UniProtKB/Swiss-Prot annotation:
The gene is LMBR1. Changing R266Q: In Lmbr1-N; associated with preaxial polydactyly. It comes from Gallus gallus. Residues 246-286 form a coiled coil. Belongs to the LIMR family. This is Limb region 1 protein homolog. One of its GO terms (biological process) is signal transduction. GO terms for cellular component: plasma membrane. It comes from the Eukaryota.
């Protein structure tokens, strides 16, 4: 008996060591990839003092950690879905014994823990540390900046906890719930993270439909469009003449007229960009022009249509079946049954749709006017803007598993703290979320595909000069002689 107990303890010990090793290796890979992504966009700093260089380096490491956690949260649900199918297909395979329910539950718990840590501690610390200068009267240095940062963090924590305490007390006036608020770890922080998750899902609800319609424009800019009834040689000739004319103007302007020089340089950059695109289209092969672009557009349309159909079916399931709710539906467990009707093919389709929704949400996020200034630029993004981008991506990625389960994209149950959010058990919130997503996505797609017809109707009616087009982003501005902007 003692030998058996020792053997069981050894197996548990080796299993835990193996899980920690796998988690560490996965996170190390994500951290390295995140570091290269951030350094690609981070502004190359000029010669700085040692103190500022250390502060920037610490903020960079914290931002990289947050971006790695965001990537882990995005991969969480796809990894769990594919792991469930692998365990069903090869239940006794020796080489996949490391892949088990304990590992997957541990990954979900770590993702939840690190998301809370980054959102409430690391990112506020990085921002305040970057902006701090030290209190007046204290000796300047790293210690003074750390002290100021810690004080700001304590004040921020008191403010946020006080707001959540008042909000929860107003929502639920029960005495028992008031007393439970004093239990910080068991109630307060999960309640706060539940609110953040709800905000993230609402942000996804706003960004994803916009991104789904915007994806067609983005892919159209990245791919080479078919040259139907277009003479690229003539366009190249015209662009070359424009470039030469602007270059002659720049050479003839004196150095004292700085405003005109700056405007002409901007026009020259735009012309060069158009010329580069035309050269790329001219060099593209026939199959790239005539096959790749239509195939990608059709693929995007199919993925978007499947997403909307799945949401529509999920609405019907919610009305007739209580197990369709994202909270409280006890699943069969990992490796016990397939959660997709079509088995491995259905699981692969779910994973593709989850990644597609995440990419669309990011595209939609940066397409919103309020977040346009957040768009990172290569080698020209400040550290403050990088922190803002990391926080935004973290909120979106942390809410992605919740949104995917709420919309019925997958039937995989949310594990860890992701499945304990109170609002997931509210039928009216979940149903309203599905209805709003389906309606907003449909409206955005209809608006996208009917914009060309609408513009032609406005031109035919002579109303195109009234600027009724609802796509001001695509219009170009040109300065007039009196300094005002004219829309072309």
């Amino acid at each position: 008996m003692e030998a058996d107990e020792v053997s069981i303890r050894e197996q548990n010990f080796h299993s835990q060591v193996r899980e920690y090793t796998i988690c560490f290796l996965l996170f190390a890979v994500l951290y390295i990839v995140s570091y290269f992504i951030i350094t690609r966009y981070k502004r190359k700093a000029d010669e700085q003092e040692d103190e500022d260089a250390i502060v920037n380096r610490i903020s960079l490491f914290l931002s990289t950690f947050t971006l790695a956690v965001s990537a882990g949260a995005v991969l969480l649900l796809p990894f769990s879905i594919i792991s469930n199918e692998i365990l069903l297909s090869f239940p006794q395979n020796y080489y996949i014994q490391w892949l088990n329910g304990s590992l997957i539950h541990g990954l979900w718990n770590l993702a939840s823990l690190f998301s809370n840590l980054c959102l409430f501690v690391l990112m506020p610390f990085a921002f305040f540390f970057l902006e701090s200068e030290g209190f007046a009267g204290l000796k300047k240095g790293i210690r003074a900046r750390i002290l100021e940062t810690l004080v700001m963090l304590i004040l921020l924590a008191l403010l946020i906890l006080g707001i959540v305490w008042v909000a929860s007390a107003l929502i639920d006036n029960d005495a028992a719930s008031m007393e439970s608020l004093y239990d910080l770890w068991e109630f307060y922080l999960p309640y706060l993270y539940s609110c953040i998750s709800l905000m993230g899902c609402l942000l996804l609800l706003l960004c994803t439909p916009v991104g789904l319609s915007r994806m067609f424009t983005v892919m159209g800019q990245l791919l080479v469009k078919p040259t139907i009834l277009e003479d690229l040689d003539e366009q190249m000739y015209i662009i070359t003449l424009e470039e030469e004319a602007i270059q002659r103007k720049l050479n003839g302007i004196s150095s004292t007229l700085e405003n005109q020089t700056v405007e002409l340089e901007r026009e020259l950059e735009k012309v060069k960009c158009k010329k580069t695109n035309l050269e790329r289209r001219k060099k593209a092969s026939a199959w790239e022009r005539n096959l790749v672009y239509p195939a990608v557009m059709i693929l995007l349309l199919i993925e978007t249509s499947i997403s909307v159909l799945l949401v529509a079916f999920n609405i019907l399931y919610l009305l007739v079946d209580e197990t369709a709710m994202p909270k409280g539906s006890g699943g069969p467990g990992i490796g016990n049954a397939s959660l997709s009707t079509f088995g491995f093919v259905g699981a692969a389709l779910e994973i593709i749709l989850i990644f597609y929704l995440m990419v669309s949400s990011v595209v939609g996020f940066y397409s919103l006017r309020f977040f346009e200034n957040f768009i990172p630029r290569k080698d020209d993004t400040t550290m403050t803007k990088i922190i803002g981008n990391c926080v935004s991506i973290l909120v979106l990625s942390s809410a992605l598993p919740v949104m995917s389960r709420t919309l019925g994209i997958t039937r995989f149950d949310l594990l860890g703290d992701f499945g304990r959010f109170n609002w997931l058990g509210n039928f009216y919130i979940v149903l309203s979320y599905n209805l709003l997503f389906a309606i907003m996505t449909t409206l955005c797609l209809v608006r996208k595909f009917t914009s060309a017809v609408r513009e032609e109707l406005l031109k035919a009616l002579g109303l195109d000069k009234l600027h009724l087009s609802n796509n001001p982003r695509d219009s170009e501005t040109k300065p007039s002689a009196n300094g005002h902007q004219k829309t072309l």
